[in-house]
Amino acid sequence: MTASPVRVYYSKVCKCYIAALSRAAENTGDFIMSFFEKLFGSFSDKELKRINPLKDKVLALEPEMQKLTDEQLQAKTTEFKARLEKGETLDDLLPEAFAVCREADWRVLGMKPYPVQIIGGIVLHRACIAEMQTGEGKTLVATMPVYLNALTGKGVHVVTVNDYLARRDSEWMGKVYRFLGLTVGLVVHGVEANDRKAAYAADVTYGTNNEFGFDYLRDNMVVYKANMVQRGHAYAIVDEVDSILIDEARTPLIISGKGEDSSVMYKRADDFAKTLKKSVIVELDDKVAAEEQVDGDYVVDEKRKTATLTESGVQKAEAFFHVENLADADNMSLRHYIDGAIKARGVMHRDIDYIVKEGEVIIVDEFTGRLMYGRRFNDGLHQAIEAKEGVTVAAESKTLATVTFQNYFRMYDKLAGMTGTASTEADEFSEIYGLNIVSIPTNKPRARKDLPDSVYKTVNGKYNAVIEQVAECHAKGQPVLVGTVSVEKSEALSKLLKKKGIEHNVLNAKQHEREAEIVAQAGKQGAVTIATNMAGRGTDIMLGGNVSYMAKAALRKELSRDLTKDLAQLKDEYEHAKARAKAAGTELPTPPEETIDAQLEHLMTECDGHAETEDAAVLHARQRFEELCEEFEPEIKREAAAVREAGGLFIIGTERHESRRIDNQLRGRAGRQGDPGASRFFLSLEDDLMRIFGGERVQNLMDSLGLEEDVPIENKLITNTIESAQKKLEASNFAIRKQVLQYDDVMNQQREIIYKQRQMVLDGEDISDKLHEMMRQSIDDACTNYLNGETADDWDFAGLRRHFMNWLCLPSDFNYTKDQLEDLTKEGIADELYKRGMDILTAKEKKYGSKTMRELERICLLRNVDSKWMDHIDNMDQLKQGMGLRGYGQHDPVVEYRIEGFAMFDEMIASIREDAVHMLLTIEIRQQNAEPKREQIAKPTGEGAPTQAGTKGAAPVRVTKIGRNDPCPCGSGLKWKKCTCKEYHPDL
């Protein structure tokens, strides 16, 4: 019997009602939080109320500051420093210091911070995150807290996400600090060690997060204190703080050296992975049950992004590699290669997670869409992808030093940050970094309209709607920015727009060279720009276009014409000079084309720069640039008015990101400084986020309503479902980052102990007593180990003799009569060995002198600390790799890692103790008149390698006796302590 229309309608309403109740239950926690914030006010609201009176004090001082001459204003810096020395605090100085800096901003830059920017500056001084919308002038905001905190003389670090911004801001804002009598330094890629040291010694240091972190690691690898560049971590302001402290939190900084070449095994593992059948599931809830259900050799869990062999896959692996049991400990390395191969083929996708360019696999940043040159996936995944793509498989690397951004930035006494999107990650900022977020009001009311999501059943339906929306906006002259999540999808949309005959620019990881130009001109009338997330931040999109880029384009043509007008004459001169150089056998001159190109690029870089210069060509280029800006200004204003009339910039999102924050960044490109604009997300049930996280509920709703693929649904229920999925994923990613931190906290505690011990050596402290204690402890440990029987008859004298052979023992030692055994004690034997050691050291001091002995002591301890620590890093990494399976045994992997990790650390400390003492007792100097020099144990390879420490041609040191961990000279391949040959072990 056919149901009546009323019954059908009632059924649909019930389904919607039930779904709404379900969603309401999920959002109860958010509702309660929102209720209490409305009732009592959020932290941000309360903080703004506390800050407003301070802001008013700063503004009230403006007339007083305006009356001061430049010299009087500059003298305030000296006055403030003197007041700090007399006991005043930075908080006491804040109103005056901010007012002084604000006036300096105006006199030097022609910009005066607005009241809301003063609020932002106070928030930064209070070690919070200032959440400021796009176009609100974060760069200028930072000048006030930077100036105030630099007065302490401890140094302020301003951290940016790339070299360009660090250089630009150090030159631009640096003018203000220099005007006020402060020094400014810059730390970017390529800066030499001596210049880095000077940069860190400055009052204000600009640099990237990577450079600050790597310099910290390099400082803890140097062998002389003079080679260290950083001087402490007092105060840092992190620009785009969410990008650095959240998005980059799972990526450790690693300085590595050359490791083993395992390319053959990676290729074999990939050959095996090609033969396997893949099975994809949304979520692997029950591993065992899932493996029984799936029809494949390995399972790809889309939600967790993992790949796991099934029982069928294990059997095939054992047959392919001719092993009996893949789970055996002996096959752990093989399992590592196989796991990497199936993850490379099942989880990692070309043109989404990475691209292949000129025979190299380059990572695509999932948050920005930019190429991450120099970065590599860890745990051998990068090599597995290289094998999959058929490019050269690079050798594995050995980790020499490592730290996460989480633990690096938690070292600062005071930390603050700026971003346009932080609120969605408030819990993480608070829990991990102790940072609260204050939302700064905009200077002008926001006029952007955020339209409801349009959800379609299929991707085709969604793309058709996107093209229609773009065509509609384009027809009326409204600029459009279309955001995509991958290279692949941006190119698919580009093809559809070409078919429609709509001119557009594409900006993705493959076509990033014109990024700044494309994004800056994305606000021109009728412009259409398709971009991955790389357009989400960092460059302002100005309505009507960017006058600076128009002026630069015109200036490039003029300069190119001027520089090449005498090219023919220059070529003739070059040919004559080249002939003379060949005849004389001297170096050939540079071709004029190369010289002209280099000069052109230099002038184009400097034409809008801020660095002080006396170069006439640069000064002329800057003057002409300003003139061209004035010429283009009226045209830009007319076009901007037309764009505003058309509705401003229209933002189209074609897919929701895993994080709401990234979506908000895309929306934030429109509506800067009160400009009109709009945003809308076009989604489909086939999108990854919808398909994996809760799309079934929406699918059922759309099916029940009988909607076709090109008919959208715009409903709050849909939006709530999507946001709920994003919140779940954000919580999941937070949990992962938190676990990364928990693991790294174990390493961090150990790292602090090791680095503190290194620093003690570098500082030149007298470590003689420390080494004497280490010798006593090593002797006591050995005696406890070998002399552990109840009576002397049960003691292992042969073992003790082997242990100390050739440094504290001779083959004739510990041969006792029965009567002598009765009088022996462990303490007596230990005392005798310790006395021998002290006698050896006393003789060495007499032979070499106290100065040389102190240096030898430092060499021995430093070499052993460094070499053992590097091995320990690898061992801890291997331990962590095996921790995942502990969860199946009802054990907390982090707790197990901490317990076993510190047991390994204790073993390493004992090894450092014994080997350092052994080296000190046996070391000899070849050249009596030469002072011993320290040498770096391991040297990094590739980019970011630290400058080699020490002195070239230093007098070498040598160990005259065989070390316990040295290879036995008999050629067995065993360490001396484990070899049983008679020739080199006469006591056996």
Please describe what each predicted stretch is.
Residues 1, 6-8, 13, 18, ...:
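Short hydrophobic transmembrane-like helices used for membrane targeting/insertion
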Residues 12-13, 21-30, 569, 573-617, ...:
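Acidic, low-complexity intrinsically disordered tails
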Residues 21, 29-684, 688-701, 756, ...:
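Conserved P-loop NTPase motor core
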Residues 251, 480, 537, 869, ...:
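Glycine-centered loop/turn positions within well-structured domains
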Residues 354-362, 368-376, 610, 643-644, ...:
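Extended, charged helical/alpha-beta scaffold domains that provide interaction surfaces
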Residues 477-490, 763-764, 791, 818, ...:
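Short, Lys/Glu-rich amphipathic helical modules
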Residues 482, 530, 869, 905, ...:
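Hydrophobic, well-ordered secondary-structure elements that form the walls
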